[in-house]
Amino acid sequence: MFKNLKIIKLENRALLKIKGEDSKEFLQALVTNNINFISNEKSIYSALLSPQGKYLYDFFIFQDSKSNYLIIDCEKNSYQELIQKLNIYKLRSNVEINLLDRIDVYTVYGSDLIKFISNLKMTYQEGYTKNISDNLFFIDPRNKSLGLRVYSNNLSNEFKEIASGILSDWHYLRIKNNIPHPYIDLEKEKSFIIENNFEKINAIDFNKGCYIGQENTARQKYRGTAKRKLVTAEIIGKDVTNGEKIVFDNRAVGTIRSSSKDICLVSIRSEVYDKCKRDNIKIKINESELKFL
């Protein structure tokens, strides 16, 4: 029925259960997005920063529809660090943080996605959330083009009939839409999220009030102090490698981030990007050229 639809089981995810009467207030004071946006019909994407406003962790946050406790969907290889960091800030708050197991995470994407979403009687908008037969679904809050996230310990037959996808194809879709994968495209304790499209992917609420790193993040937005942009470029020639330096006018101006097939993400100085776009300039890197899209 849905030939142009793929499903991938995301093996690199971990789920944390946040419960206790202070859990919402606790997270609201820490993370970049607004916890009060979360409901049984709305999930969010957010980040935890250092006091200097630099990237530490990113995650999805949603609500268990039965008990109303919060669930954080984060990278599996850093969940223990994240728990430790959250516990440091917990102090006397009535909050419990535990690993939630026996639930698998999937992403569903493809050109038939809108029809499939309609079949589930869901609204095709970022963060829209629905619980169906004890399975939780939400449209990716970063960009609806990234697909449907599914949380289940027993997929229904309609999902089992979807063909398996390839993670590299999903990354191509991500890069095409200029969306960072933080553990590839950002450097922990070094990168600023304003310079890496976190506002564009709905991870920051500038009206919520204070959170860790808020002052520097707000300054970069309102005073225009951000120096770099994360942009998508076409690769003309041979493949490029994550971490390769970009030189323009005899000075280092940027770095290659994630790539897939003939496109990549590039962290580059804003004035260089603006000049290249304005004057239709390609940047040479080894045996290739980059054309900003």
Language model regions located:
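Acidic, proline/glycine-enriched N-terminal capping motif
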Residues: 1-58, 64-67
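Short amphipathic beta-strand starts and helix->beta connectors
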Residues: 1-3, 44-58, 88-91, 129-137, ...
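Acidic, low-complexity central loop/insert segments
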Residues: 6-8, 14-17, 60-177, 248, ...
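Short, surface-exposed ligand-recognition loops at beta-strand->loop->(often short) alpha-helix junctions
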Residues: 17-23, 108-112, 234-241
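Glycine-rich, small/acidic residue-mixed loop/short-helix segments
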Residues: 55, 196-202, 214, 218-293
